[in-house]
């Protein structure tokens, strides 16, 4: 399982311009040509091969965060280093790398000095504060890079940089031990990976979905139990199984978390990955009696990203994807927001299409 630079790999000379999909105003995605820039100190230039379309891209596309327009979205980008900026060490031209939501830590703030790179005070979010991967070329901080194992195609690796990393990191840091019951609520873009990771980490896995049509998929992904929230109370169903030590919430909505909270066993934790504006209505009695907890988990740092990719390669965890040409990003984004993706849409560039030679996608 190698992730080292390909020996003898040469990249074609980069042209003076490249194709990108940028947002110039809320909800306006357009294909443009941009001039190629040189990487600055501590940065690398990447020839993008694939970039996942993530629900969090709506923060940029819909202007939910303060944005300096125009901006290129995309934070599940995989490609090859084309140029190194001054001072970059440990990376090589031709090496295949990934860039996730966290654009790179500063290394000197209070949180970095205490080892908490996720909450770096000077962290830039890829595709929000800096241009992301909906493009043939991007510039990224070297401190935010992840190594891509040869086991994955670029398109197959892309969703693991956000959806995979987020679920893997939350489960790895969860207060559950192998053999204990872990529930994954939602079998979508995050949940279908969460079920796989939970199974391969040795947990007893309950998948919670809506409707009977997801039952077969849940079992195929590795769930020991399937709970249909449309047919029964999921909290009661979890208690019938002995109570969950952890409930991983991959679907947005405070009501969703609250509806399952009583399914936790004493000392259990509900970990929220789904961002939404709804308040979480849980009584203090539900928290205190049984000492149950609610926590949020944003994502993981680049080292955890490396671990996510290695673990996925070793265990066979993979994202269910469909690929779309970069130029069709607007249509792909619309389908994703309408809930029509099954389960991750990945944009591929011309470089990505020409390099589809990996063993597994």
What does each model-found stretch correspond to?
Residues 37-51, 62-110, 149-152:
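Glycine-rich beta-strand-centered segment in the early N-terminal region that forms part
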Residues 97, 150-236:
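Mid-domain Rossmann-like dinucleotide-binding core that forms the NAD(H)/NADP(H) cofactor-binding site
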């Amino acid at each position: 399982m190698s992730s080292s630079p390909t020996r003898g790999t040469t990249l074609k000379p980069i042209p003076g311009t490249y194709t990108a999909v940028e947002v110039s105003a809320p909800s306006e995605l357009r294909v443009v040509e941009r001039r190629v820039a040189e990487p600055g100190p501590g940065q690398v230039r990447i020839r993008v091969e694939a970039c996942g379309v993530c629900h969090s891209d709506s923060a940029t596309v819909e202007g939910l965060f303060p944005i300096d327009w125009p901006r290129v979205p995309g934070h599940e980008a995989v490609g090859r280093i084309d140029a190194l900026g001054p001072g970059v060490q440990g990376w090589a031209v031709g090496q295949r790398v990934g860039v996730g939501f966290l654009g790179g830590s500063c290394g000197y703030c209070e949180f970095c000095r205490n080892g908490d790179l996720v909450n770096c005070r000077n962290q830039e979010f890829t595709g929000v504060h800096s241009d992301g991967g909906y493009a043939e070329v991007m510039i990224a901080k070297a401190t935010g890079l992840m190594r891509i194992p040869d086991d994955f195609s670029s398109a197959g690796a892309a969703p693991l940089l956000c959806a995979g990393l987020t679920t893997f990191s939350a489960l790895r840091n969860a207060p559950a031990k192998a053999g204990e019951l872990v529930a994954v609520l939602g079998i979508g873009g995050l949940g279908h990976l969460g079920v796989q990771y939970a199974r391969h980490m040795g947990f007893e896995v309950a998948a919670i979905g809506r409707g009977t049509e997801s039952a077969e998929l849940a079992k195929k992904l590795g769930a020991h139990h399937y709970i249909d929230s449309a047919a029964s109370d999921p909290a009661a169903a979890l208690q019938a199984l002995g109570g969950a030590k952890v409930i991983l919430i991959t679907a947005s909505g405070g009501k969703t978390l609250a509806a399952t909270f009583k399914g936790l066993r004493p000392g259990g934790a509900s970990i929220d990955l789904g961002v939404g504006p709804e308040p979480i209505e849980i009584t203090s009695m539900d928290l205190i009696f049984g000492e149950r907890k609610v926590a949020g988990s944003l994502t993981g740092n680049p080292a955890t990203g490396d671990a996510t990719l290695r673990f996925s390669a070793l265990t066979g965890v993979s994202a269910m994807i469909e690929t779309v040409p970069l130029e069709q990003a607007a249509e792909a984004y619309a389908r994703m927001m309408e809930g029509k993706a099954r389960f991750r849409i990945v944009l591929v560039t011309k470089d990505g299409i020409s390099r589809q030679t990996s063993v597994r996608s």
